[in-house]
Amino acid sequence: MQNFIFISPNFPTNYWQFCRELKNNGLNVLGIGDQPYEELKPELKASLNEYYKVNSLENYDEVYRAVAFFISKYGRIDWLESNNEYWLERDAMLRTDFHITSGFQVSDMPRIKFKSKMKEYYQKVGIATARYHMVDNFDGCKAFISEVGYPVIVKPDNGVGASHTYKLSSDDDLRHFLIVKELEVSYIMEEFIHAEVNSYDAIINSKGEPIFETGNVSPISIMDIVNNDDNSVYYIVKDLHDDVRKAGRATVKSFGVRSRFVHFEFFRLTEDQPSMGKKGDVVALEVNMRPCGGFSPDMMNFANSTDVYKIWADMIAYDSTLMPQGEHAFCAFAGRRDGKHFVYSHEQLMQKYQGNMRMVDRIPDALSGAMGNQMYVATFPTCLLYTSPSPRDR
């Protein structure tokens, strides 16, 4: 029996389903988290063979001791994963320290966590990347801006989501950023790309081959949602575009991905941009070596009439899957921000789209910055072109 340690199986709240499918496939599923056992969902408790509670997952020594305890009790650990961006480096440290070879090691982290390091691997397979400059001082940044022009995007070179991301449109913006930026954080400055975000989401086997593929489109960037306190909108595509599939598969090979659920983000240019390409071209944004966040795995299920939790667990247990896919549809997510005025009330939305709704819930505070406060997930056979609402209706 294979031993699988799942870090933070209780959060995100839908991740217990990964554990359920691992256990259904005969693995010994061992959880490590900082939530008291008695507060875990009954479904999660039933999906774990054992749970080790630590005071804080931020405390490496505590988590290290938890892994050591499981090894002393169950023997060699075959897998250790969180499927969570926040813990990717922690996962790699634990694998390296305990010689768990089924996933990324500490030495792999730079190319998959640092945005500046990713560019080399995109370029190896002919995928265009934005020009960039590592933030130093005003004069250095201005020299770069003189080449690419305003606006520019500035974000942590190693960052999660859109936190501490800035759009600078003037010298005054640049001066302000240089004053307020965190001194201990390394920032990357990139030329602004006129585009929408298209993703490649896939479950990859040990040979670097996809056993499941889909993708999403984000008409509003996460940066704008977070910085403008806006509503969140994105959707899972009914069928993955061939150019996104091609770029995604090339990226898998270039980055040496094995045995993972991945979420790769690309820009699709909305206008010609001489430094990047023609309108409609797919160019690089960043790689994320984990599933798309929030309720996206459930949305993938709705869009493809399948179960990605099981497909992922099948990849772990068998390196393949027999899980079928049924009828495809578009699956849309709308996250509404509390305190804003909307044309339709909650009750009116539920009445109008009752036949389409798949999930309706409040969003946990930890995710609300990028996703809004009230979420709706619905499926549709067709997709109308999204247009940004007026400020009144946002």
Identify the meaning behind each predicted range:
Residues 1-105, 139:
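ATP-binding N-terminal substructure of ATP-dependent carboxylate-amine bond-forming enzymes
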Residues 111-194, 205-209, 234-246, 250:
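Active-site nucleotide/adenylate-binding loops and adjacent lid/helix of ATP-dependent enzymes
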Residues 314-353:
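A glycine-rich beta-turn/hairpin centered on an aromatic-Pro dipeptide
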Residues 386-393:
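Conserved small/polar residues in nucleotide/adenosyl-binding loops
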Residues 88-97, 107-123:
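Well-ordered mid-protein domain cores that form the structural environment of catalytic cofactors
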Residues 354-385:
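Polybasic (Lys/Arg-rich)
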Residues 169, 336-338, 377-383:
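Short beta-strand-to-loop capping motifs
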Residues 191-257, 261, 268, 272, ...:
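ATP-dependent carboxylate/phosphate-activation module, predominantly the ATP-grasp catalytic core
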